[in-house]
Amino acid sequence: MADAEVIILPKKHKKKKERKSLPEEDVAEIQHAEEFLIKPESKVAKLDTSQWPLLLKNFDKLNVRTTHYTPLACGSNPLKREIGDYIRTGFINLDKPSNPSSHEVVAWIRRILRVEKTGHSGTLDPKVTGCLIVCIERATRLVKSQQSAGKEYVGIVRLHNAIEGGTQLSRALETLTGALFQRPPLIAAVKRQLRVRTIYESKMIEYDPERRLGIFWVSCEAGTYIRTLCVHLGLLLGVGGQMQELRRVRSGVMSEKDHMVTMHDVLDAQWLYDNHKDESYLRRVVYPLEKLLTSHKRLVMKDSAVNAICYGAKIMLPGVLRYEDGIEVNQEIVVITTKGEAICMAIALMTTAVISTCDHGIVAKIKRVIMERDTYPRKWGLGPKASQKKLMIKQGLLDKHGKPTDSTPATWKQEYVDYSESAKKEVVAEVVKAPQVVAEAAKTAKRKRESESESDETPPAAPQLIKKEKKKSKKDKKAKAGLESGAEPGDGDSDTTKKKKKKKKAKEVELVSE
């Protein structure tokens, strides 16, 4: 029998089911309609997490510390807040018109929306147009962080004399990158001090040699004066130049492509809501403040820890559910709830590696609390000792502040440690110690100086000692003479006193006669 040839057929690879990415319109509808929440379970979400809204985007890629927590019904998804809260915790990406100042524009929006407080990130000069982020009420807490964010501009520079082609202008623009010295222009809203501002990138878009106009794009640090940059361009080219027109195309996270709205849009949206109760246009015009924080590293907290943070508690590791990769010490991060609401801005005190290895400790310190207090219920003071303390206050064994009284059991006094009092004592002790330490330091410094001066002094020569002895002997003689005269008062003393009186009288008479 001939050997039968065995033919091995190649295995069919099963194709992985690829999730079809939905069109943007459908995603927007789903985001506004459904409830989005990081649930205490490890099931895959229905909608791809890359299409989840705002700060919950790609939450499944965050490092998981624990999935166990008790969800609370309080709070809501930023996109599904009630219209009043939605506006009070929102911002507008406004296309600023030419001529009115930034402060005027912001005041008009405050009047249109009928809110108490508005603020803007990075002032634009009256003639400058473009991206102006207007923060409303609660969102004004983020103004500082947005003011210091990078900016992008498109400007037109007019040269005073002709140059050969646009290559010279593009070279000059490339030269004026990096850290530059700038003094604000003559007409400026700030003090005219020399300062350093960084230009990250710049490029020429177009140059018209007939009209001597150049269009350029600049990405720069906050507080850079483009007018001054245009003057410097003219000086560098040797022909002189000035800024003709300017538009801001990006401010921090928001650009002019991110649904920028005009003043008319805001006015129309408010009119529709007032007259037809249609809030859909207002929701398009105003964005939740969480959109400004999408570039920050995230830290997801348990619902039970949220209100404590709003009251200024330390961000401790047991309250953390998830954390992002690449967190560094002293980096600005955003602390969020499981529903994607921003609780506060914080400064990280642990890196991602330390968070993953530790089981206790302070993760970050609060920089700015964003969320309103008591949005979530209070969940502190529910431990065994705290519960016992509350019961004893009810029974009258402790006073209303939880301090021991005459009727307090001896066992409680011995066992219970009031950490708030111990902390106060430590602070008082430190305050008392501080002046003592300062006094001791001053004494030691004095001693050092004295010892140094003594060591620096040379031994005195013999003639100086002789002089000192002579002076002493003279003093002793005078003292003895004084004692003798004091012991035996004679007529001489009375004569001298009489003479003095006569002299005084004579002087007085002379003065009167003059």
Swiss-Prot record:
Spans annotated as Nucleolar localization: 2-21
GO molecular function: box H/ACA snoRNA binding; pseudouridine synthase activity; RNA binding; telomerase activity; telomerase RNA binding
Crosslink (Glycyl lysine isopeptide (Lys-Gly) (interchain with G-Cter in SUMO2)) position: K20, K39, K43, K191, K394, K413, K424, K433, K467
Active site residues of this protein: D125
UniProt biased composition (Basic residues): 468-480
This protein's UniProt keywords: Acetylation, Cataract, Cytoplasm, Deafness, Disease variant, Dyskeratosis congenita, Isomerase, Isopeptide bond, Nucleus, Phosphoprotein, Ribonucleoprotein, Ribosome biogenesis, RNA-binding, rRNA processing, Ubl conjugation
CC per GO annotation: box H/ACA scaRNP complex; box H/ACA snoRNP complex; box H/ACA telomerase RNP complex; cytoplasm; fibrillar center; nucleolus; nucleoplasm; nucleus
SMART domains: DKCLD, PUA
Modified residues (Phosphoserine): S21, S387, S451, S453, S455, S485, S494, S513
Gene3D superfamilies: Pseudouridine synthase (3.30.2350.10), PUA domain (2.30.130.10)
Crosslink (Glycyl lysine isopeptide (Lys-Gly) (interchain with G-Cter in SUMO1)) position: K413
Region of interest (Nuclear and nucleolar localization), residue spans: 446-514
Its EC number(s): 5.4.99.-
Residue intervals of the PUA domain: 296-371
N-acetylalanine modified-residue sites: A2
Presence of keyword RNA-binding: yes
Phenotype upon changing M350T: In DKCX; decreases interaction with SHQ1
Enzyme class, first EC level, given as a word: isomerase
Keyword match Cell inner membrane: no
Tissues of expression: Ubiquitously expressed.
Annotated consequence of substituting E206K: In CHINE1; likely pathogenic; decreased rRNA pseudouridine synthesis in peripheral blood cells from a severely affected female; unable to fully rescue developmental defects in dkc1-null zebrafish morphants; does not affect interaction with NOP10
Assembly information from the UniProt record: Part of the H/ACA small nucleolar ribonucleoprotein (H/ACA snoRNP) complex, which contains NHP2/NOLA2, GAR1/NOLA1, NOP10/NOLA3, and DKC1/NOLA4, which is presumed to be the catalytic subunit. The complex contains a stable core formed by binding of one or two NOP10-DKC1 heterodimers to NHP2; GAR1 subsequently binds to this core via DKC1. The complex binds a box H/ACA small nucleolar RNA (snoRNA), which may target the specific site of modification within the RNA substrate. During assembly, the complex contains NAF1 instead of GAR1/NOLA1.
NCBIfam families: CBF5 (TIGR00425), PRK04270.1 (NF003280), unchar_dom_2 (TIGR00451)
Family: Belongs to the pseudouridine synthase TruB family.
Name recorded for this polypeptide: H/ACA ribonucleoprotein complex subunit DKC1
Native species: Homo sapiens
Lineage: Eukaryota, Metazoa, Chordata, Craniata, Vertebrata
